[in-house]
Structures are given as structure tokens and as C-alpha cells.
Amino acid sequence: MIMNHSLLPFHTFHLPACANQIIEFTTVSQLITEWQKATRADQAVLILGQGSNVLFLDDFNGVVLVNKLKGIQHREDHDYHYIQAQGGENWHNLVEWTLAKNIAGLENLALIPGVVGSAPIQNIGAYGVEFEQFCDFVEVVNLANGQIFRLDKQACQFGYRDSVFKHQYRHSFAIISVGLKLAKAWTPTLNYGSLVKFSADTVTSQQIFDEVCAIRSSKLPDPDEYGNAGSFFKNPIIDATTFAEIQTAFPQIPYYPQPDGNIKLAAGWLIDQCELKGFQIGGAAVHTQQALVLINKAHATGRQVVELAQQVRRRVRHKFNVELHPEVRFIGQTGEVDSEEITR
């Protein structure tokens, strides 16, 4: 238990924020007990993994519970590998664990920061692959009554960086473990960036893993050097008519057709076209290598990051008439606040 302690080491933006209390839990019963104790005392409660997708705007006037649930189990049948990983396991370490056992499938999701329990919330994705493709179940606890239950993939209502855990199960519930189902008949996903150079007939999952790690390491800043939360904005999805108008004005715009007929745009490219790389407000800046990443360049505050995000959204809106939506969760004094509203 840590009283009135800095949250700086508990989130990757490394902003100067404190919490009344920080408790690392290693069992589900401890999580339930501490959550109920804080709730009875009318204390706000925030459950964190590695804090890789949060922005603290102020000191948190409540209790922060840090997920340290550990353990990975594996079984298999003729066609599939089944993995159950506890919510506090590091996601990238899990990807490495699967590859060490010659289990392919997760290699495109290498080096995504955070813990396993956060993966379903965001439906994390990268390089043409999303978490939902491998989700077998998500194990959840109702913190109010201690009931533990599983949701299958359909019940998770996955969308682009979205799930039921951002809505119906946002409050009073916690993800304690995740079940993955990985086919033994592996098909590589090579339709993104430099992965297209590989042949589907000869490439190995380890080669894809190494390439993805190299790409991410070259483009994304190390949080220990410059605090950040990875991609700050989602890639916007627009209808085909709107896209046609934008493409007429900007023929070179990169785009990704979606199965439903809509078009996904590259948020980083849009920001870059607004000449915002390196743009700075206080200690917060747009990263010079990857415009989609906002960084804590020099002792930034949460409010400075918000101001920077506001400017980015406004410039992109003005130039392209496209709305960027924050991917990062904004945490105020007593809990999550509306990132859309605060950066409008």
C-alpha cells in the first residue's frame, strides 16, 4: 500500500499526479476487498494495469488499484492452442511466450504496451490484426458482489478500439483474465507497411515479430525517455462520399477501405500534413517521428497535453473537415472524464 504517492511511475506519460492511495493487488479476493472498502468510504476507485493508455489531468482524489494478477495456462487440441492469461501479465511478454512455444498468431501485436487485462477494453490492434480475432473469452468479476463470469467474443461487442468494457461493464467490473484461441493452421497477415515484403509461403511468425518490433521501436518514442501513451488518436473512419471529396483535394492521401464500405484514414498523416510535428505547448509536444504520438517532452502537465490535443484536433478539422477522436483515457480528480468534450 502506498499513501499519497506519486502516480508518475504507474503510468507511461510520467505526469506529475498523485493519488490518495495506491494498492497493488495480486489476487482477485484482494481486488474485491479493496474495491469494496474504498466504495464504502465513498472514495473514487481507478483500476490500472501499466497505465499505458491514460492521461492524468489532475491529482486523483481516490484509490488506485494496480493489477498484478499473474499466470499463463496452455492447453491444446488437434486444431487450436488455448491460452488463459491473467490480467496483470504484460501483453508483449505474452506474445513472446507464445512464440517461444512455437504458437503463432499474435506476432503482429508485438510491443503494444500494457497488460493483458487492458487488451479487450481497447480491442488492441496493429499491422492488420486486432485482439478480437483471437479472443475466446474474457473473465470478469463483478466487484460489488464478487461474482466471476465469462463473456464470449460475441458478448464482448468488439469494435474499432471499442468493446462492451467501455460501456456496459465500465463501472464496478474488472477483467481478471483473458482466454485466447490460436489456430494451428496459421495464416500470416502481411498487408501492412513493410510486412508486404515477406512471402506468405515462406515467412515465419518470428520474422514478422522481429519486423514489427523494429518498426515500432523506430517510430515510437521510449516512454522512459519521453513519456507518452502511444497513439493518442484513433484512425478516423469516414463514409465513402466524404472520402471522395477529401481525395479530390488531397490525391496523395493514404486510405484503407473497410468491409462495410467506409474508409479508414491515417490520423498520423493528417496531423503531419498540418505541419504539426514538433509543435509544442509547454512541456507537451507532437513527436517529430510519429505525429500520432503526443509526448511529455519536458515536465509537461496533463492540462498542457490537453491543450496540445485541442490544437491538433482543431487544425485537422480545419484542413480536412475530419474529426479526430482521442484513443487515450482521460482521468480527472474522481475518475474518467469525456476526452471528446475536453479536447473539442
From Swiss-Prot:
Which biological pathway?
Cell wall biogenesis; peptidoglycan biosynthesis
Query: Any idea of its EC number?
Result: 1.3.1.98
- FAD-binding PCMH-type domain mapped to chain residues: 15-185
Task: Please tell me where this protein is predominantly located.
Answer: cytoplasm
- Report the leader peptide range: none
Where, by residue number, is the active site?
161, 231 (proton donor), 327
Protein function: Cell wall formation.
Instruction: Identify this protein by name.
Output: UDP-N-acetylenolpyruvoylglucosamine reductase
Q: Which organism is this entry from?
A: Haemophilus ducreyi (strain 35000HP / ATCC 700724)
Q: What is the lineage of its organism?
A: Bacteria, Pseudomonadati, Pseudomonadota, Gammaproteobacteria, Pasteurellales
